[in-house]
A protein has these predicted regions:
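Beta1/beta-strand and adjacent pyrophosphate-binding region of the FAD-binding site
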Residues: 1-12, 166-176
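Glycine-rich flavin
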Residues: 2-4, 20-27, 32-166, 199-203, ...
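Short hydrophobic core segments
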Residues: 7-9, 113, 128-138, 173, ...
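Flexible, glycine-rich terminal cap/loop adjacent to redox cofactors
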Residues: 7-35, 40, 47, 51-58, ...
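FAD-site-proximal beta/loop scaffold in flavoenzymes
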Residues: 150-166, 258-259, 263-330
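A Rossmann-like FAD-binding core segment of flavoenzymes
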Residues: 107-110, 114-122, 190-295, 358, ...
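Hydrophobic "anchor" residues
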Residues: 48, 121, 272, 299, ...
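Glycine-rich dinucleotide-binding loop and its adjacent helix/turn
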Residues: 46, 137-192, 196, 224-225, ...
């Protein structure tokens, strides 16, 4: 039996960063990984997706090259090279994490871990024990109870990231972050993209006004949206010339409708990875939504913590990272000032979108006295120079004390602007603090300064 100060199950953004942080502060760590180092984010999520997003952005820029006085006599998308580049980026970053896991004090174990009891984890024939255990097993794609989801060509984001050709017609079920990013990417790649969403608007994490404007902007590029639509089934059918296709049947406002596709992407959310962990043997409480934790991410078992997607609180890679750092700090007896109430997020469609804090919908529902300040990319010098005039920023301010309550935006550099507001919000800053901060000219970030004055 191997004993260390800390066992971490999972080497995603939460697990590997926590392991390194712990080792740097003198703890011995056993980190266990059933698949590839880096977890879903690096291997099947954030990084490969964002690599494809960059490819799509280059295509979009080339399609409008004439605006910049560049005459192109056509161009060819070499999809195998696109996917090769994606894999090279993933492998380079994975190699870096594997090197990081060689830090003195860290023992990296490959295999599937499950609990024997509240202090012991088993991997194969080996047993590992520690003073504290951190569960960081992430999440997996969630498939809705729809007839036909097991048919060939009905896939999740994992399979789409390894697809070997660009589908002529792509139907996406779900208009959340995953669905919207892939809709944007494959539309740029040349697919005819249809998106079916049950809710009234896409991207519920965003202010509904911002989400609607983003959807309309992407729609102008040819993506077809069917909102407030419930998918009933997916079936194999044939085209007029006898080729196999998939037909998605859905209901929109009580009326039946269909869309034909070559590939159907299921993008209806994710579920915590808890299967096979034998949490019952450790006495850890959980539900289908995830492992129950307190504000320090401790489970009902004092020495066991759960961070990231597996606790179901916030399925973002950076949320997992900072939750893991916070847990290590608690184990070390160190206080930190990480503010988990300020959790920014970004959607890398083209154009991109981002948010932090309250939306206008939430503020209205709470009856909060607030002021909404708006800015537009079309009025910004740098945005005009870049030909990136589609965009809007909404900044919400408490009328009583001027504190910034939230920022939601779409358009070029939205994630950068939201990052700035996140830093201010984490310190309880006011609109006056933003107005007094000198902003570089010319930058798109000046939109924030202009609406703060």
């Amino acid at each position: 039996m191997t004993k260390t100060n800390l066992i971490i199950i999972g080497s995603g953004p939460g697990g590997y960063r926590a392991a390194h942080h712990a080792a740097q502060h003198g703890l011995t760590v056993t980190i266990i990984e059933a698949a590839e180092a880096g977890g879903t984010c690096l291997n099947r999520g954030c990084i490969p997706t964002k690599t494809l997003c960059r490819n799509a952005e280059v295509i979009d820029t080339m399609q409008h090259a004439d605006v910049f006085g560049v005459a192109l006599d056509g161009f060819q998308l070499q999809f195998p090279k696109v996917m090769e580049r994606k894999q090279q980026v993933v492998e380079q970053l994975r190699s870096g994490i594997e090197t990081l896991m060689q830090t003195p004090g860290i023992t990296f174990v490959r295999g599937f871990a499950h609990f024997k009891d509240s202090e012991t984890v088993v991997v194969g024939d080996e047993e590992y024990t520690a003073d504290n255990i951190m569960i960081a097993t992430g999440s997996d794609s969630k498939c809705p109870p729809i007839e036909g989801t097991t048919l060939p060509g009905v896939i999740t984001s994992t399979e789409l990231l390894d697809i070997d050709n660009i589908p002529e017609r792509l139907c996406i079920i779900g208009a959340g972050v995953i669905g919207m990013e892939f809709a944007s990417v494959f539309s740029s790649f040349g697919s005819k993209v249809s998106v079916i969403e049950f809710l009234k608007e896409c991207l519920p994490v965003l202010d509904s006004d911002i989400a609607k404007r983003l959807r309309q902007t992407i729609g102008k590029r040819g993506v077809e949206f069917s909102m407030q639509s419930a998918v009933k089934s997916i079936a194999e059918t044939t085209t007029e010339d006898g080729k196999r296709q998939l037909t998605v049947t859905y209901e929109k406002k009580g009326k039946p409708a269909q869309v034909d596709a070559d590939v159907v992407l299921i993008a209806t959310g994710r579920k915590p990875n808890i299967e096979g962990l034998d949490l019952e043997l450790a006495g850890v409480e959980y539900s289908p939504k995830g492992i129950a934790v307190d504000d320090d991410f401790r489970t009902n078992v004092e020495s066991i913590y759960a961070i990231g997607d597996v606790n179901g609180r916030c399925m973002l890679a950076h949320a997992a990272t900072f939750q893991g750092l916070h847990v290590v700090n608690k184990i070390l007896g160190k206080e930190d000032e990480i503010n988990f109430d300020v959790m920014p997020s970004a959607i890398f469609t083209y154009p991109e979108a981002a948010s932090v804090g309250k939306s206008e919908d939430q503020l209205k529902a709470e009856g909060c006295e607030y002021e909404c300040r708006k800015g537009f990319h079309r009025s910004n010098g740098k945005a005009l120079a870049m030909n990136e005039t589609d965009g809007m920023v909404k900044l919400f301010v408490n009328k009583a004390d001027g504190k910034i309550l939230g920022c939601h935006a779409f358009g070029a550099h939205s994630s950068d602007m939201v990052q700035e507001i996140s830093a201010l919000m984490s310190k309880g800053a006011t609109i006056t603090d933003l107005a007094n901060a000198i902003h570089i000219h010319p930058t798109i970030g000046e939109i924030l300064h202009d609406i703060a004055l």
